[in-house]
Swiss-Prot record:
Binds together with bS18 to 16S ribosomal RNA. One of its GO terms (molecular function) is structural constituent of ribosome. Belongs to the bacterial ribosomal protein bS6 family. Residues 107-172 have a biased composition (Basic and acidic residues). This is Small ribosomal subunit protein bS6. CDD domains: bS6_chloro_cyano. Pfam families: Ribosomal_S6. Coiled coil: none annotated. It comes from the Bacteria.
């Protein structure tokens, strides 16, 4: 199956479904794909999120993403199963280009996402001495975005230095 294209299917479940039923839906669609000749490469529960626009009477939905590989015939079987259940309020399958995703199964609940955000935006308080020897309190933010931005600036600076060196070599 390595020469076959791979696909990503994102589907949205009703927000009122209990978490154990969400797991059973994921297992059900994985079995349907495999029985139709496809291979599941990755599955991710994205959790409950607000919809961009209401679908039916729902303003929220539980997002699930499936990455799968096959000859394309398995997609019709999967989408037919999704169309026939009332729990799936929307689905979309897209053919992907590029390298295959790593094969894994990740389940993320809403509680874990909130805990991760709290850890990412954690502030620490440290005591530093100023020049006079007096203690002063400083706060250091450990926001991942600021670290990523700083690393990005460093990468840009390094790239410019390399580019300048290459220009100097060409001039010599």
């Amino acid at each position: 199956m390595t020469n076959q294209p791979y696909y990503e299917t994102m589907y949205i479940l009703r927000p009122t479904i209990p978490e154990d039923e969400v797991d059973s839906h994921l297992k059900k669609y994985t079995e349907i794909l495999e029985s139709a000749g496809g291979e599941v490469l990755d599955s991710q529960m994205r959790g409950k999120r607000r919809l961009a626009y209401p679908i039916g009477k729902h303003k929220e939905g539980i997002y699930v993403q499936l990455s799968h590989q096959g000859d394309g015939q398995h997609i019709a079987v999967l989408e037919k199963a999704m169309r026939l259940t009332e729990d799936v309020i929307r689905y979309l399958t897209v053919k992907q280009d590029g390298p295959l995703p790593a094969k894994r199964v990740v389940k993320t609940s809403e509680k874990n996402v909130k805990e991760d955000k709290e850890v990412e935006n954690k502030e620490t308080t440290t005591e530093d001495k100023d020049q006079k020897g007096d203690l002063k309190e400083t706060k250091k933010s450990e926001n991942k975005d600021s670290v990523t931005e700083a690393e990005g600036q460093k990468d840009i600076k390094e790239a410019k230095e390399i580019e300048n060196k290459e220009i100097e070599k060409k001039e010599d």
